[in-house]
């Protein structure tokens, strides 16, 4: 009898899982999606110039020691049109990521390490970061970032 109850309970759980469709997000200019509730990274997108990536990552790791909520992972990668992308995260949503962005950009050590280079600092979801790395289309992402996250 208990085996039969388990089977029924499993079927109910399966139906619940089927009934909750994944959120289908509309793409902005066929490239990026906008979802404030998704996990986000803070990203420094280096577009021109040379920066000591190890020093930059150490500055971010040191700054993260003061961040409430635990360990943040600092990683570096690259992408089309980006010699260097440094990410910090993951943050539970865009609000938390934006709070981090506002705080970290006040760091004098960070400002000094980014002198004389071209870069953008943004918050971004994993899917959008993957799309940005492949496409290299920063202009479209910056439009979405300004409209969606900055309200401009």
Where are these regions (language model features)?
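Acidic/polar low-complexity segments and flexible, solvent-exposed patches
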Residues: 1-152
């Amino acid at each position: 009898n208990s085996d039969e109850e388990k089977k029924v309970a499993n079927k109910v759980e399966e139906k619940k899982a089927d009934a909750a469709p994944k959120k289908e997000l509309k793409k902005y200019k066929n490239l990026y999606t906008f979802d404030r509730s998704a996990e986000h990274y803070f990203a420094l997108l280096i577009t021109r110039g040379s920066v000591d990536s190890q020093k930059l990552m150490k500055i971010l790791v040191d700054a993260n020691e003061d961040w409430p909520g635990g360990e943040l992972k600092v990683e570096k990668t690259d992408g089309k049109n980006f010699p260097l992308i440094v990410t910090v995260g993951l943050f539970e949503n865009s609000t938390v990521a934006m709070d981090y962005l506002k705080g970290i950009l006040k760091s004098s050590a960070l400002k000094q390490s980014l002198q004389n280079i071209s870069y953008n600092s943004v918050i971004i979801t994993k899917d959008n970061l993957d799309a940005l790395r492949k496409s290299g289309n920063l202009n479209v992402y910056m439009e979405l970032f300004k409209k969606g996250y900055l309200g401009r």
